[in-house]
């Protein structure tokens, strides 16, 4: 696998196991700076498992183990010396369903900063506003910062979760089907936001929607039965895929 000088992260020879079950087979994949990569494939193909390897969320599963390398800025994130808390700050994650804390809007965004020892009120206020602006949510909640985040709409809650991830200044943003639980208008806002965020972040998104992958990503990677079948520029993947399995999946012949 060729790793370019623009690579922010890469996986090389990655194997992942749940106990004796091998869920990922020899994955080689590079993520370049300021690009959006969509991971596609049918349910159970390994795309979400792979995504969770990128910030070691799978460490939370006792029977799991990893072989191979995942590197961030050239450093193996599975090296025993790696601070996993710091890794998850650098590689943030937004989940499928909005998961705001039962706290105020302000405290949801400030949470990660407080965990990292930030106490200065002025700095917290500045970072909360900046993060909400980056998540295209500030104008909708600026007068509701002390209200419960649970009172926001589903789309607003998901953008709040994005703001919460952005507040701790990540370098990579992982998104696991971030719009699957949202209506079309809220989905459009998330997709517009992804286009803006890629100017500052490297984004890796799992999606079941071929249309969404085509709209938001620069690169698409197709997974099937735990293997990376094909990867390439999204426009080419959706119009001239090299692999017959890729073509069959994208055209809806199986899923």
From Swiss-Prot:
Membrane topology label: Peripheral membrane protein
Main location: membrane
Sorted UniProt keywords: ATP-binding, Cell inner membrane, Cell membrane, Membrane, Nucleotide-binding, Phosphate transport, Translocase, Transport
Catalytic activity: phosphate(out) + ATP + H2O = ADP + 2 phosphate(in) + H(+)
EC number(s) per entry: 7.3.2.1
Residue stretches making up the ABC transporter domain: 9-250
Enzymatic class: translocase
A GO term from the CC aspect: plasma membrane
Subcellular location: Cell inner membrane
Gene Ontology terms describing biological process: phosphate ion transmembrane transport
Function as written in the Swiss-Prot or TrEMBL entry: Part of the ABC transporter complex PstSACB involved in phosphate import. Responsible for energy coupling to the transport system.
Quaternary structure and partners: The complex is composed of two ATP-binding proteins (PstB), two transmembrane proteins (PstC and PstA) and a solute-binding protein (PstS).
The name this protein goes by in its record: Phosphate import ATP-binding protein PstB
Organism from which the protein derives: Nitratidesulfovibrio vulgaris (strain ATCC 29579 / DSM 644 / CCUG 34227 / NCIMB 8303 / VKM B-1760 / Hildenborough) (Desulfovibrio vulgaris)
This protein's encoding gene: pstB
